[in-house]
């Protein structure tokens, strides 16, 4: 969820020094100050947790909060009972962290490249961002990277998964979503607990996104709700295709060998083309629906384009795998895990073959 949704490995080990190790696994930053802010942020999150059922049963709590939390528990039970996702304490506790995002992720690229600045570690593999619990720290780190000639983008994250090592809480940042999106987010994060392949973000996010989508369809059916035409999902998919097309053009430009000034001018023209194509699509196909205007019309650079495509690249492949498994979740998870055990090049070929047979 993204989005939405990119830090995945804090608290991997049940020991007092886990925040420091988790920070190292994710961030790639050698600064003890950086480790310290992650440790403090994660410990504050753990300290803020409360049992969801106690809040639901407390008449002193706002009725709207109690109703939303009750819905999350129905979705949480469905996730384990019907989707075969891990049955543990995650999302049966709640934390109000008093801010709009749980972390802010910082992405960075060179001026003429779409290759992210990455940080690689034995368990987490390589990740293309660093996470900060305070927006000011993320912006400060971004400023330092820009002084080194890198382009940066900072994006807020509503939730992340600790992959089952601790009981991940529901967060106030998650409750602003509508009922379907809230249930889908729970399915997505639990899917990361079900299967995670170090160093392969596209695989992990596509797997979780497929479980989210198929799980939401089954969740709605279980509640007697009609299958919906997900206009929001179609718009997101269309926007993603638009951005990926722009990325392909930029990659060709950066490989051209043009002098820097010419490349800089052509790059600016590509970003303006992206905005122009977006406006046409918005007005022609979406009836003026402007949810993405602020993102599109804001400052644009390579780093801002990095997250696109990560969440859906292999969804067609996982959909084909689910059909091959006869719609049986446990069989699907076993086959997905087998893919995850392959060397990355072999795994990519297998996913490409599955996607071709969708």
Where are these regions (language model features)?
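Pan-zinc metallopeptidase signature
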Residues: 244-358
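Post-signal peptide N-terminal segment of mature Sec-exported envelope proteins
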Residues: 35-64
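C-terminal motif of bacterial Sec signal peptides marking the signal peptidase cleavage site
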Residues: 27-28
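Metalloprotease/metallohydrolase-associated module, dominated by Zn2+-dependent proteases
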Residues: 34, 45, 49-52, 180, ...
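Acidic/His-rich structured neighborhood in mature extracellular/periplasmic domains
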Residues: 75-236, 247
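Sec-exported extracytoplasmic/periplasmic mature domains
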Residues: 57-61, 70, 74-84, 191-195, ...
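Solvent-exposed, acidic/flexible segments
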Residues: 45, 58, 65-72, 131-138, ...
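Bacterial N-terminal signal peptides that target proteins for export
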Residues: 2-18
